[in-house]
């Protein structure tokens, strides 16, 4: 098996980092510093729900969620695609360029990277992504660029689709045979004494949920991470961007958060 340090690394960027230029600058600065010394290829996948929420509020349109997924009426998908594949993607690309990186803004559709189909008619223009052809993305990586990929995709019929960013990152990682890190404001899963749990499988997570160690919104995050590990067929990591000094360790293949193990 290839050493994790040699596999490409897909970083799904979420949480408040997307709206904080200082946090983004620390992340991109760490990537630039790391890639001056090492050859590991890194890909960013992002959502941008906060931008969509702001846009919906300005347009006085309701935000409706079902099972944690944004309901996206087909007449609203051009607006949401504009916010995610347009504004959010270009803001991230601009920050990366300002921090010395050769950043390329992409979507799930570019080069056939991910195939996208409608997930559930009741959700509207919400798609499920599956791994596609990574050859164009690999060419971009081989050129030394940092791909920044929005979670907007296209169906085979050319219909715009909004894909959950975690699920999009799993599909991108699958296409690239890459390691996956979900990077957010959550450092990982803590035990009852506030110590970081280094790894979790479904059985261990169920026991912690039953014991009220994992509660509330963290339950959703844990189940989503375990589902991502199962879909990808390898361990994934949930870690935080809050400690920039740890990021280069993460890029080098060290665990700095909680590893979620597939069944």
UniProtKB/Swiss-Prot annotation:
Site keyed Transition state stabilizer: positions: 12, 221
Domain of life: Bacteria
Reaction equation(s) it catalyzes: N-acetyl-L-glutamate + ATP = N-acetyl-L-glutamyl 5-phosphate + ADP
One BP annotation, GO: L-arginine biosynthetic process
Any one GO molecular function term: acetylglutamate kinase activity
Main location class: cytoplasm
Keyword annotations from UniProtKB, A to Z: Amino-acid biosynthesis, Arginine biosynthesis, ATP-binding, Cytoplasm, Kinase, Nucleotide-binding, Transferase
Subcellular location: Cytoplasm
This protein's pathway: Amino-acid biosynthesis; L-arginine biosynthesis; N(2)-acetyl-L-ornithine from L-glutamate: step 2/4
InterPro entries: AceGlu_kinase-like_sf (IPR036393), AcgluKinase_fam (IPR004662), ArgB (IPR037528), Asp/Glu/Uridylate_kinase (IPR001048), NAGK-NC (IPR041731)
Residues of the signal peptide: none
UniProt GO cellular component terms: cytoplasm
EC code: 2.7.2.8
UniProt: substrate binding residues: 48-49, 70, 162
Function: Catalyzes the ATP-dependent phosphorylation of N-acetyl-L-glutamate.
Family matches, as PANTHER family: N-ACETYLGLUTAMATE SYNTHASE (PTHR23342), N-ACETYLGLUTAMATE SYNTHASE, MITOCHONDRIAL (PTHR23342:SF0)
Family affiliation: Belongs to the acetylglutamate kinase family. ArgB subfamily.
HAMAP family assigned: ArgB
Protein name, UniProt field: Acetylglutamate kinase
Species in which this protein is naturally found: Vibrio vulnificus (strain CMCP6)
Phylogenetic lineage: Bacteria, Pseudomonadati, Pseudomonadota, Gammaproteobacteria, Vibrionales
């Amino acid at each position: 098996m290839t050493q994790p340090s040699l596999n490409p690394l897909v970083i799904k960027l979420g949480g408040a980092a997307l709206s904080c230029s200082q946090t983004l600058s620390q992340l991109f600065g760490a990537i630039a510093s790391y890639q001056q010394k090492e050859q590991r290829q890194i890909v960013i996948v992002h959502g941008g729900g906060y931008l969509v929420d702001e846009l919906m509020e300005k347009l006085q349109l309701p935000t409706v969620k079902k099972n944690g997924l944004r309901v996206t009426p087909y007449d609203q998908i051009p607006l949401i695609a504009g916010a995610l594949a347009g504004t959010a993607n270009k803001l991230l690309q601009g920050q990366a360029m300002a921090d010395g990186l050769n950043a390329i803004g992409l979507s799930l559709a570019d080069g056939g990277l991910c195939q996208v189909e409608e997930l559930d008619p009741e959700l509207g223009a919400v798609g499920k992504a599956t791994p596609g052809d990574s050859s164009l993305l690999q060419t971009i990586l081989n050129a030394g660029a940092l791909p920044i990929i929005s979670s907007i995709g296209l169906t085979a019929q050319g219909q715009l689709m909004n894909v959950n960013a975690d699920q999009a990152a799993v599909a991108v990682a699958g296409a690239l045979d890459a390691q996956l890190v979900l990077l957010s404001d959550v450092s990982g899963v803590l035990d009852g004494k506030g110590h970081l749990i280094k790894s979790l499988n479904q059985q261990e997570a169920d026991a912690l949920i039953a014991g009220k160690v994992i509660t509330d919104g963290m339950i959703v995050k844990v189940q989503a991470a375990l589902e991502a590990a199962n879909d990808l067929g390898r361990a994934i990591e949930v870690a935080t961007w809050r400690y920039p000094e740890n990021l280069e360790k993460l890029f080098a293949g060290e665990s700095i958060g909680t590893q979620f193990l597939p069944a």
